[in-house]
């Protein structure tokens, strides 16, 4: 979606520079892109570096980057995340362009009572309903943050929604189920209670087996939701040589022997996170099965590499196309990974 929006903006504003940022970039490309964005719209950016620039990004822009936008347009999301996003708006003292002297954030929403399908799938409709009802036309940050967030998540007060319709009640119940699932999942990763035995050191303090009823037994996840699938993204040219995508005309990657430590570190930095649906229950088995089979077939020698033996490789052709579990993939250094389902 971010890629489609970026393309539309570039078409509408041909003289502007549009930079896109999302999770489906190879690690090295993403690092370069983060550095570029920080330089262009970060704390030390200049009027010249900011002029005529449009940044299109997903939630990854919320993570750690000290960005400072003149104007923001965002999709509706839960209140705490929305307020976090606005923290990147007029973040530092600087002279703003004419007409943008006052910080303004435009929140995209549906014209009826429905919600964007992607946002509803990620956050659930209940929190979006409450955020929509509570969001004021004017915000004072940070003083407004505590009350707005508290009201959004206070299940004892639904006055902002008026009389609950059947649709609202259904969304509320779905949110309870979603929250309960998250709570049960989090319980699997609780630190064990401290022992009263004297003299016990901290060694093993964080050890805690995953409970048998955990749906992702054996996988110690760090985020909610479906498991993500990370691959090492490489290219196989027409001569059958394996290369780094970023400099496909230069670096050749060994497939018939364990790579040296320097080579292994370079390969490990080519990690790419696949779109979320590859991690869904109905897709993940086929995805992992194909990745493991192809990795074993081409890179069996890597089993002797401590850094790479647990990794799976996704090979793109020289045009940077690949097929994975019935999905056509294409990688572009400027726009990242795109896909087309069969």
Predicted regions span which residues?
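Conserved two-lobed SF2 helicase motor
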Residues: 47-62
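Short amphipathic alpha-helical segments, especially helix-boundary/capping motifs
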Residues: 10-13, 59-63
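C-terminal helicase lobe and adjacent C-terminal extensions/tails of nucleic-acid helicase motors
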Residues: 1-45, 69, 73-342
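Flexible glycine/serine/alanine-rich "lid" or loop that lines and gates the nucleotide-sugar donor pocket
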Residues: 66
């Amino acid at each position: 979606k971010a890629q489609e929006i970026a393309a539309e903006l570039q078409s509408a504003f041909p003289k502007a520079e549009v930079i896109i940022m999302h999770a489906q970039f190879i690690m090295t490309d993403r690092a370069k892109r983060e550095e570029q964005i920080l330089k262009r719209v970060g704390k030390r950016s200049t009027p010249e570096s900011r002029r005529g620039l449009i940044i299109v990004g997903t939630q990854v822009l919320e993570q750690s980057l000290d960005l400072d936008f003149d104007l923001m347009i965002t999709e509706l999301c839960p209140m705490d995340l929305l307020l976090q996003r606005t923290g990147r708006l007029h973040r530092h003292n600087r002279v703003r362009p004419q007409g943008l002297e006052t910080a303004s954030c435009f929140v995209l929403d549906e014209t009826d009572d429905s919600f964007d399908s992607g946002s509803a799938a990620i956050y659930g409709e209940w929190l979006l309903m409450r955020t929509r009802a509570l969001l004021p036309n004017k915000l004072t940050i940070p003083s407004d943050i505590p009350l707005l967030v508290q009201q959004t998540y206070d299940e004892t007060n639904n006055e902002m929604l008026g009389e609950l319709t059947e649709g609202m009640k259904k969304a509320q119940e779905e949110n309870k189920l979603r929250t309960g699932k998250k709570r049960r999942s989090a319980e699997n990763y609780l630190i064990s209670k401290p022992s009263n035995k004297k003299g016990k050191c901290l060694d093993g303090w964080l050890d805690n087996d995953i409970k048998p009823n955990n749906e992702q037994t054996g996988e110690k996840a760090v985020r909610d939701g479906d498991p993500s699938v990370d691959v090492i993204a490489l290219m196989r040219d027409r001569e059958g040589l394996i290369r780094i995508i970023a400099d496909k005309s230069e670096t050749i990657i060994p497939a018939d022997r364990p790579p040296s430590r320097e080579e292994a570190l370079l390969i490990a930095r080519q990690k790419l996170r696949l779109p979320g649906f590859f991690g869904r229950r109905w897709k993940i088995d086929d995805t992992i099965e194909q990745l493991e089979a192809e990795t074993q077939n081409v890179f069996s020698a890597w089993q002797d590499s401590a850094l790479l033996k647990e990794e799976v490789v996704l090979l793109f052709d020289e045009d940077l196309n690949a097929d994975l579990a019935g999905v056509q993939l294409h990688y572009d250094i400027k726009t990242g990974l795109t896909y087309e389902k069969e």
